[in-house]
Amino acid sequence: MGPGLAASHVSFPDSLLAKMRDLLQYVACFFAFFSAGFLVVATWTDCWMVNADDSLEVSTKCRGLWWECVTNAFDGIRTCDEYDSILAEHSLKLVVTRALMITADILAGFGFITLLLGLDCVKFLPDEPYIKVRISFVAGTTLLIAGAPGIIGSVWYAVDVYVERSSLVLHNIFLGIQYKFGWSCWLGMAGSLGCFLAGAILTCCLYLFKDVGPERSYPYSTRKAYSTTAVSMPRSHAIPRTQTAKMYAVDTRV
């Protein structure tokens, strides 16, 4: 009764910590899903720059990484013009932001798919929990890396828009239209921060639970059972030899 009670006290914290680890994986999966979606939507939408409220325009003009759209304020008609070929000359801000956001999209998508394979509810390597934890760790590292180009591209674009507008105001130059960064830029920042958060959960928090669960107890119990058997065998043979030796010693004395 004593050993069984002790075993129940030992297994209860392990099961609780294992549930906490699974919960962290699901929370990270939630953030990774929406972060990857935000990055993809931000890359392929047209509202990275939008005309400010103090502009003398009767229409809303948005500029994205690939095209520019104008929406008439009276009838709501929307027209879009694509930029020139990707091989044409573009501003450094546009080219670098494109490259950074596409890189972030690919890495975030790969990290999310990898994380799905590491979840316990997914029937992938069900008998290898240690490998699944490793897969989740790789997914977290990938998401951390994905957040870097995303946040660099989004913040650089936003800062460039702000500096351009501030320079015009500082020099009293008014062109009739002024831009501010739009919701696509905000979406890129949010997606990048979400990737950082998901990656931090998977790498830092799961590291604290790396010794919890069946991936730890199974090898240890196997080694313990093997060592107990190996030790008990010599003892069982040692008892008859010792008694025989004592009897032989008594006979010789007599």
Curated annotation (Swiss-Prot):
GO terms for biological process: bicellular tight junction assembly; calcium-independent cell-cell adhesion via plasma membrane cell-adhesion molecules; cell adhesion; monoatomic ion transport; paracellular transport; renal absorption. Residues 44-98, 156-188 are extracellular. Expressed preferentially in kidney. GO terms for cellular component: bicellular tight junction; plasma membrane; tight junction. The chain crosses the membrane at residues 23-43, 99-119, 135-155, 189-209. A motif (Interaction with TJP1) lies at residues 252-254. This is Claudin-16. It comes from Bos taurus (Bovine).
